């Protein structure tokens, strides 16, 4: 079944196909397609017991949205090139902030909160997924997305490499292609998240206004390249309604959050602040998928 309508506390489902036999009087549906993040951001503090660690713990608590956890995927560590300073790195070793300064600096708390808000923002964006796969037949807004090296036809996305991932060299030019596989026009947007949690709008192209994409029509942006090696996540959004540009502005930009009115716009606006709008049910006239591309250094396999 697919979601046909969403109310304040209920959702109406429509069967995707005629039932084989008689249905019981009462059915229970379990939502399994949305990936809501935790209310707080788990951060590990890899520092020895000291006044500096105590100051880091206090600053982390003061953010209001991050909590200390030994299993956190984001870690606070000693800076490699600045004695006494604190750095922020991801669990995979990616350095997210080479130095946040010393823990006793007056501005340390603000720098820490800003760096962690970027991490939380990305978690919220990734949690917009409505499908765990790009070929989900039950998706109300099916969109085929392909992020690959330049040179392929719009309808012929190259196969993934070993391990089910795509690897693209740093010097290669890349193309992002989306195709509306549904039966009605939809607005399609593509966001790119780099290894350092910076977020950029890939589609619509710079300077273009968003237009509904007709069924079976590709929309492409070519000639792009990666800035650094590592994992890039691409969030592909398909919506029955256009999304205000304000909703894509990241924290620190000028925008009117109150103008974000549709459920998807409200979720995007909240995610830009590193939080989730609890008043929005994460279902509606939109869908989202996430794909990952590994940008490899020159000479890497």
Regions flagged by a language model, labelled:
Residues 1-39, 199:
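Beta-strand/loop-dominated core regions that host nucleotide or nucleotide-derived cofactor-binding catalytic loops
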Residues 28, 36-301:
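Secretory-pathway glycoprotein ectodomains that are cysteine- and/or Ser/Thr/Pro-rich
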């Amino acid at each position: 079944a697919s979601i046909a309508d969403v109310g304040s506390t209920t959702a109406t489902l429509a069967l995707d196909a005629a039932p084989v036999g008689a249905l019981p009087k009462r059915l229970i549906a379990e939502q399994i397609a949305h990936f809501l993040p935790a209310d707080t951001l788990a951060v590990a503090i890899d520092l020895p017991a000291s006044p500096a660690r105590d100051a880091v713990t206090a600053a982390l608590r003061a953010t209001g949205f991050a909590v200390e956890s030994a299993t956190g995927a984001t870690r606070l560590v000693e800076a490699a090139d600045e004695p006494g300073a604190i750095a922020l790195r991801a669990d995979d070793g990616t350095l997210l902030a080479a130095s946040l300064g010393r823990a006793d600096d007056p501005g340390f708390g603000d720098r820490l909160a800003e760096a962690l808000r970027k991490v939380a923002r990305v978690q919220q964006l990734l949690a917009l997924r409505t499908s765990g796969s790009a070929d989900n037949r039950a998706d109300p807004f099916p969109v085929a997305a392909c992020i690959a090296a330049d040179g392929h036809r719009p309808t012929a996305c190259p196969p993934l490499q070993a391990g089910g991932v795509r690897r693209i060299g740093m010097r290669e030019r890349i193309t992002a292609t989306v195709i509306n596989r549904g039966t009605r026009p939809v607005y399609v947007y593509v966001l790119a998240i780099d290894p350092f949690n910076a977020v950029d709008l890939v589609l619509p192209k710079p300077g273009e206004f968003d237009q509904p994409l007709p069924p079976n029509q590709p929309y492409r942006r070519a000639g792009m390249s990666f800035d650094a090696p590592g994992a890039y996540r691409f969030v592909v959004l398909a919506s029955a309604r256009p999304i205000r540009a304000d909703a894509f502005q990241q924290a620190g930009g000028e925008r009117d959050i109150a103008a974000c009115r549709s459920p998807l716009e409200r979720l995007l606006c909240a995610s830009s602040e590193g939080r989730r709008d609890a008043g929005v049910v994460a279902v509606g006239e939109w869908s989202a998928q996430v794909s990952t591309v590994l940008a490899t250094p020159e000479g890497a396999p």
